[in-house]
């Protein structure tokens, strides 16, 4: 928010959230309540209008560890509810959701799995 405040032409500003980074930084997002609270706080502090994309991945590490270790969808500590909430949230409909998981051979399976959650 401090950086955005300093930018004169805010139409050129965008933010990308990474699901594993969010969890590693200490933001719990795996329950309906924590998901709503985290994105409510994001909107209040930064502004949801600045969210232009999201990196989608599971995490090998728990909340607050400050360790970024991406995992395949459904294979880490995130749980499928998080991904279901993202896929069903209309705010993300026209936003790039970039799969950033470690096993290339699983990408097509993971993409199909995410679409089935919609």
Q: How should each PLM-predicted stretch be described?
A:
Residues 1-71:
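Acidic/histidine-rich catalytic cores of soluble enzymes
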Residues 1-4, 39-40, 80-84, 111-115:
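Generic structural signal for well-ordered alpha-helices
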Residues 36-45, 77-89:
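A short, acidic, amphipathic alpha-helical segment used as a generic capping/interface helix at domain edges
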Residues 55-58, 99-103:
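Acidic carboxylate-rich catalytic motifs and surrounding loops in phosphoryl-/glycosyl-chemistry enzymes
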Residues 61-66, 95-96, 105-109:
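Short active-site-adjacent structural elements
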Residues 68-75, 86:
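Active-site-adjacent loop and "lid" segments of alpha/beta metabolic enzymes
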Residues 87, 95-98, 102:
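Charge-rich, low-complexity N-terminal segments
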Residues 104-118:
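C-terminal helical cap(s) of enzyme catalytic domains, especially alpha/beta-barrels
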């Amino acid at each position: 928010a401090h950086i955005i405040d300093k930018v004169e032409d805010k139409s050129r500003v965008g933010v990308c959230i990474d699901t594993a980074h969010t969890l590693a930084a200490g933001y719990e997002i795996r329950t309906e309540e924590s998901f709503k609270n985290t994105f409510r706080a994001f909107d209040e502090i930064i502004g949801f209008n600045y969210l232009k994309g999201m990196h989608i991945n599971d995490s090998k590490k728990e909340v607050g560890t400050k360790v970024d270790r991406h995992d395949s969808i459904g294979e880490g500590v995130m749980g499928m509810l998080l991904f279901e909430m993202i896929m069903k949230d209309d705010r993300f409909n026209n936003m790039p959701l970039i799969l950033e998981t470690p096993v290339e051979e699983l990408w097509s399976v993971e993409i199909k799995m995410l679409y089935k959650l919609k």
